[in-house]
UniProtKB/Swiss-Prot annotation:
One of its GO terms (molecular function) is magnesium ion binding. This is Lysine--tRNA ligase. Its cofactor is Mg(2+). Mg(2+) 1 binds at E402, E409. NCBIfam families: lysS_bact, PRK00484.1. It comes from Helicobacter pylori (strain HPAG1). SUPFAM superfamilies: Class II aaRS and biotin synthetases (SSF55681), Nucleic acid-binding proteins (SSF50249). One of its GO terms (cellular component) is cytosol. Transmembrane segments: none annotated. It comes from the Bacteria. GO terms for biological process: lysyl-tRNA aminoacylation. Mg(2+) 2 binds at E409. InterPro entries: Aa-tRNA-synt_II (IPR004364), aa-tRNA-synth_II (IPR006195), aa-tRNA-synth_II/BPL/LPL (IPR045864), Lys-tRNA-ligase_II (IPR002313), Lys-tRNA-ligase_II_N (IPR044136), Lys-tRNA-synth_II_C (IPR018149), NA-bd_OB-fold (IPR012340), NA-bd_OB_tRNA (IPR004365).
Length: 501
């Protein structure tokens, strides 16, 4: 693992520090303020007639980003999370310690510098070192910069390197944290209660997806990593909670691309005595709040597309297929004509697809990518909405919507099905689809049906993909850019263990 000659040289320097009686991995030394606080607190020094203040003494810490040796002195750029600060170290103050520093210090090492503020001849506020300590010796040299396709792969595999070398990456994840905390605050202000539900399920439910399977040794049963928290959250509505939300991970054992990761973050929320129309209005308020909190304009650029949040629209599923997808009503209203049309367009259609799934194929290919401004698509086919309430006027459609922005689904919501007998029949239909080979069809969940039988009030529920939301609001082109440690194809190391190296 550490056979590289440059690594060996650094290991030798770490051992040399030990021989001098110094621990290359010290603990207990503390800074007095951050680099950013130092730069703010001592900005006045640059305006002094003699630009230094020897009466003040501070300790700063960070990683060495640049090292410039000049005989009996050196300049060091030290970076902590807040800022980069220059340190000046000279032999006059440190004597033998300076010789040790020149011998052992390298870019990448983590250090503590104690000294007073002063400004250089070029006017750069710096710390004049009176003490210098190596807190952590870096034995693997840092890359100067990332470039090229292979290095993009390395950035995702070794995110710690990405964070060290590319300062902008930290900004993305700080903004992600702000987005998540803002979403949480919004729902708390709206009167929702945050809850936690199981991550391991006896039956995978709440979405049409292929689950990950694990085994519970103590119970001697298989368990499924959750694909959605929906059915547990609705059990809470049955139990008497009227507005709940959960922000957590879901796991789906499916493909990966620029907008899909098998482990992803979602918020799901359920609101008793409300409808899916209420959720549409709530979603509009949420985006208004996020744009304001993040100081973003109503028009943002994402992947060279202008998204205007002032141009939000609502359109039915069939109207979208006709007016946006360009498919005539004559074709849309007949299953055999729709199938023939899809085949004529060169779309590979799996055998035995239901009419609703044929409509979904058409929507995915001809409509979704054209929905740039926020668009709420409503009145979904009931066949692809097994948990949604059936529309009172038309039993073939569901009281459901999906929100699309910049050509991608961002949210899915509906008025919840609370008729236990109807839900039982829907589950039976899903089981029949699974027996025909549909691996993503839902399982029968009798316990959930039994819960519904105890009475669930009229309820609306919605899910929003946090990762895609962050992509949209940060301009990230890949979901891997907004997940700290995204799923990657395995690479084996010398010990045949999966590695990021």
């Amino acid at each position: 693992m550490f056979s590289n000659q440059y690594i060996q040289q650094r290991i030798h320097k770490a051992n040399s520090l030990r021989e001098e009686g110094k621990n290359p991995y010290q603990n207990g030394l503390k800074r007095s303020l951050t680099n950013a606080a130092f730069l703010e607190k001592y900005a006045y020094v640059k305006d002094l007639e003699e630009p230094k203040d020897k009466e003040k003494c501070e300790s700063i810490v960070g990683r060495v980003k640049l090292l410039r040796l000049m005989g009996k002195a050196c300049f060091i750029k030290v970076e902590d999370e807040s800022a980069i600060l220059q340190a000046y170290v000279s032999q006059n103050e440190l004597n033998d310690e300076f010789k040790s520093l020149k011998k052992h210090l390298e870019v990448g090492d983590i250090v503590l510098v104690k000294g007073f503020p002063f400004a250089t001849k070029t006017g750069e506020l710096s710390v004049h070192a009176l003490e210098f300590h190596i807190l952590s010796k870096t034995i693997v040299p840092l890359p100067e910069k990332f470039h090229g396709l292979s290095d993009i792969e390395l950035r995702y595999r070794q995110r710690y390197l990405d964070l060290i070398v590319n300062p902008g990456v930290k900004d993305v994840f700080k903004k992600r944290s702000l987005i998540v905390s803002s979403v949480r605050k919004f729902f708390e202000m709206e009167g929702f209660l945050e809850v936690e539900t199981p991550m391991m399920h006896p039956i995978p439910g709440g979405a049409n997806a292929r689950p990950f399977i694990t085994y519970h040794n103590a119970l001697e049963v298989e368990r499924y990593l959750r694909i959605a928290p929906e059915l547990y959250l609705k059990r809470l509505i049955v139990g008497g909670f009227e507005a709940v939300f959960e922000i957590n991970r879901n796991f789906r054992n499916e493909g990966m691309d620029h907008s899909h990761n098998p482990e992803f973050t979602m918020i799901e929320f359920y609101w008793a005595y409300h409808t899916y129309e209420d959720l549409i209005e709530l979603s509009k308020r949420l985006f208004d709040y996020l744009l304001k909190t993040l100081n973003l304009p109503s028009k943002i650029i994402y992947n060279d597309m202008e998204v205007d949040f002032n141009q939000t629209s609502v359109i039915s599923y069939l109207d979208a297929l006709e007016t946006i997808g360009g498919i005539s009503k004559d074709i849309l209203e007949k299953e055999d004509r729709l199938l023939a049309y899809l085949l004529e367009q060169g779309i590979k259609v799996e055998p035995n697809l239901t009419y609703g799934k044929l409509l979904a194929e058409a929507f995915d290919h001809f409509v979704e990518h054209q929905l740039i401004n926020p668009t709420f698509v409503t009145q979904y086919p009931i066949e692809i909405s097994p948990l949604a309430r059936r529309n009172d006027s038309n039993p073939n459609i569901a009281d459901r919507f999906e929100l699309f922005i910049a050509g991608k689904e961002i949210a899915n919501g509906f008025s919840e099905l609370n008729d236990p007998l109807d839900q039982l029949e829907r589950f039976k239909n899903q089981v029949a689809e699974k027996e025909k080979g549909d691996e993503e069809a839902q399982y029968m969940d009798e316990d959930y049906v039994w819960a519904l039988a105890h009475g669930m009030p009229p309820t609306a529920g919605q899910g929003i993909g946090i990762d895609r939301l962050v992509m949209l609001l940060t301009g990230a082109k890949s979901i891997k850019d907004v997940i700290l440690f995204p799923a990657m194809r395995p690479v084996k190391n010398d010990f045949n263990i999966e590695s990021g190296e």
